[in-house]
Amino acid sequence: MGGESTIKIMPMLSLRDASRASAFYQSAFGARELSRSASGEGRIVALLAIGEAEFGVVDEAPQVGNLSPETLGGTSVRISLVVADPDAVAQRAIDAGAELIFPVEDQPYGWRQGRVRDPFGHHWLVGRPIGETA
């Protein structure tokens, strides 16, 4: 792709309360907030990282089509978090306010994995390949 040495995908999660979401992701997944800014309308945009994986959280803006899962009534995207100890990370997310979708278990497709829904409607798969550590 045109001489680029690095290509990254950085999801931007639309939420009803980006400030609260940033705090949740820090507590639940050990995210670090790298930056934060506010638009002229007061909407928050924050850049976070879990390990080396960066993602953004932004207050929803219906006028430009940035809608939260709460507004949409669900989500079609699952975010996969590959970690050494999925049991502990999933439990930490639940303790921070996530809802358990299915528990961390050995799956027939070769992963130890579970799924939680964060308080903002986003689904997180938490796991690792069986027999490996992240």
Model features per residue range: what roles?
Residues L15-D17:
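Conserved beta-strand-loop-alpha-helix junction that forms the acyl-donor binding cleft
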